Amino acid sequence: MLLTRSEPFGIELIVDEYDEYSFTGKEFGAIVQYPAANGAVRDYTDFTAAAHAKGVLVTAAADLLSLALLKSPGEWGADIAVGSTQRLGTPMGFGGPGAGYMATREAYKRNMPGRIIGVSVDRLGNKALRMALQMREQHIKRERATSNICTASALMASMVGFYCVYNGPEGLKRAADTAHLAAATVADALQAMDYKLAAADFFDTLEVSAEAAVVQSLALENGINFYYPTEGSVRMSFDEVTTPEEVAEVIRIFAAAKGRKAKAVKPVTESRVPAALRRRTAYLSEAVFNTYRSESDLMRYIKKLELRDISLANSMISLGSCTMKLNAAALMQPLSLAGFQMMHPFAPADQAEGYMQLITELENDLATITGFAACSLQPNSGAAGEYAGLMVIRAYHQSRGQGYRNVVLIPASAHGTNPASAAMAGMKIVTVACDDKGNIDVEDLKAKAGEYSSELCGLMVTYPSTHGVFESRIREIVDAVHDAGGQVYMDGANMNAQVGLTNPGYIGADVCHLNLHKTFAMPHGGGGPGVGPICVAEHLRAFLPSHPVMPTGGDEGITAVASAPWGSAMLLPITYGYIKMLGGNGLRRTTEMAIVNANYMSSALAPEYRTYYSGETGRVGHEMILDLTSFKKDYNIDCGDIAHRLMDYGFHAPTLSFPVHETLMVEPTESEPKAEMDRFIEALVSIKRECEAAAGQADNVVANAPHTAVEIAGEWTHPYTRAEAAFPLAWVREAKFFPYVTKIDNGYGDRNLCCRNCE
């Protein structure tokens, strides 16, 4: 992963021994693993001090569970800590999904990439949570953003959070002790048989000098997998569910490898972590991690939080460019099967035949649907898919001796991830103008393709466009780029309007990514996990992402874009089932219904809300942009006020001010029945009437939205009634949703960034 990310920027990677390296002052950063891959627990205090003396920042790739026993990276001087949260309560799932983490010091918090949830205050002065520092993110800063991240694995992070809530610091300490003491017991036994360990100090992993082939044969006979880094070494890890019987079996295997009979071993009961590296500071000290210790308590805590969210279980979520469709129960069921949950991503191929059949069939299905020759499931999000696709194009040009091609054309209407991903791939971004109807300005594109023909890498294009229309000249656009020597990357964010009717291959693109969490029915999970596979034409097949451990990808594949060879493999049965259950005709029908639903809503709302862009036929694709640009002048109400007021009607806000300022982007998907769309339409029409009635009044029902139950029940000084605030239409009473907080002060939250201990 480091090699993949660093190479486009020309960053030199130096792999060396931490205790032998001397900093020169040319370095900008260093990364160490804690514990190391071979299990070694090392004291990096002197290394970090030497780095800081030369102005170098240090990152620790740290195992979270180990930190229940080991001194925290911050204590020995690290500036940043990163890693996986998977082992805190989420299954391996043949590689994922799992949430990563990144932590840093106070001084660097405003340079953090990705989503940050911070504390602010609402209109009534109550503490409220919100996404903080959005100005640094890709949807605003585009190629100047701190990352291309759009998806955050919020669902997996929540699962890890609940695991920590339930177990608390004492539970994590108990789990860490179990893993460590099992490793220590095996270490003593192996050393007694004259095996040599790679590291004297360890947490839960041992690397042993042994004849790998002999040990592997014996281990497989006993149903155990080890990892074999070389022909002369064996590596094993233990965890909180390792049993005494399994410890004894491991010892017997190594005894048999030496032709011996295992002797009884006394279990180790005291920590072997060096005193200088033992943790002495508190963790998980907040009340929430020390309160819920029964399943009933935890269930009620989770339910309390769930009731504060508007989800698809409440009403339609009209977020444009997000495709919030039904996640059918039948598709979700396989996720609970142990065979999918418990498979290790590096398990021998003959132990993963079911997974491999599923992966192969799904790759073939997605390639067929997109009109391409091959597919990689490795990217873990749409943004990661964009990056992977661009890196494949880059590798293709390099293979032809044209590595100097580094210009990417991107329409002004494109989602911010496009230029952010291009920047991460080391590309120079040239923006292509759009015309008054929201289409790509073809003449401007042709002019820029010609101007940069000697260095053109490609074009990033979305179809239908981010403006929600099918561009009639899309093939002409593709041909112009090809004629200039470039490749065409198609953003698959809007594939829900293509499947079964057309495809990127037919249009002429060379590569596309898909959002399985949009078009192909995986849950969004409050932001993730996502899966963003790429599909490519035949001439790009050889460059699909490879992996350093498991054979996958093309013969000349780019280096890995994710830690797991097939990305978040445990989620793949969802999309596999979606495709198999619908079949070709069903997939086409879903696309048709998505387009019909969007056009129905656009037409129904037309008397009150103009659709900002439409195609040559006067129709939209699968989503529409509602024009609210005059509301501020006419009513002193902006699109954010209307989005907030929709919450009082029981609806999640649409996409706000994207891709056009002061607009709402609405995408109903094929999943919504007419009755639900009609309720949403009625709500928007009713809000328009409220805006008209409120014109010129600062204290009005729209500007003050949303209204909480506490506010409704408290002292009332507004010129409108409580009933008008809480129950604006009769059907709202049937299943009223009260937001937990009212309108949040975004500026306050950014000026006073606080993410923890913010009481």
Q: What name fits each language-model region?
A:
Residues T575-G577:
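Active-site-proximal cap/loop segments of hydrolase catalytic domains
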Residues Y34-P35, D239, N380, D435, ...:
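Short strand-loop junctions, especially beta-strand C-caps/beta-turns
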Residues L124, A132, R136-C150, A157-A374, ...:
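Non-catalytic terminal extensions of PLP-dependent enzymes
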Residues H344-A347, L377-P379, V432, M460-T462:
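Cysteine-centered functional microenvironments
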Residues T90-A103, A107-Y108, A152-M156, S237, ...:
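Conserved phosphate/anionic-ligand binding catalytic regions in large, soluble enzymes, centered on
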Residues M1-A128, L190, F203, E207, ...:
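Conserved PLP-enzyme active-site core in the AAT-like
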